[in-house]
Amino acid sequence: MKASELREKSVEELNAELLGLLREQFNLRMQHATGQLTQTNQLKLVRRNIARVKTIITSKAGV
């Protein structure tokens, strides 16, 4: 997901996206802990996407 795509969304849509990403991160962490996760780079990608969404939410709140 690109930052330019996220900037076009409303704050409500971004909050929904953030909630979905946090759930995905939780599921990936559980899979990693039980040894079921084969693509460990997914954790890094989701964490960065969460940071992108939070950054854009903060920038929209400041405007």
UniProtKB/Swiss-Prot annotation:
- Transferase found in the keyword field: no
* Key words, A-Z: Ribonucleoprotein, Ribosomal protein
Annotated InterPro entries: Ribosomal_protein_uL29, Ribosomal_uL29, Ribosomal_uL29_CS, Ribosomal_uL29_sf
CDD domains listed in its UniProt record: Ribosomal_L29_HIP (cd00427)
GO terms for biological process, alphabetical = translation
What highest taxon heads this organism's lineage?
A: Bacteria
A molecular-function term among this protein's GO annotations: structural constituent of ribosome
- Give an example GO cellular component term for this record: cytosolic large ribosomal subunit
Listed Gene3D superfamilies = 1.10.287.310
| Pfam family name, one | Ribosomal_L29
Known SUPFAM superfamilies for this protein? Ribosomal protein L29 (L29p)
PANTHER family this protein is in? 60S RIBOSOMAL PROTEIN L35/50S RIBOSOMAL PROTEIN L29, LARGE RIBOSOMAL SUBUNIT PROTEIN UL29C
Q: Which family does it belong to?
A: Belongs to the universal ribosomal protein uL29 family.
Q: Which NCBIfam families match?
A: L29 (TIGR00012)
UniProt cross-references to HAMAP family, sorted A to Z? Ribosomal_uL29
Q: What name appears for this protein in its UniProt entry? A: Large ribosomal subunit protein uL29
What is the species listed in this Swiss-Prot or TrEMBL entry?
A: Shewanella frigidimarina (strain NCIMB 400)
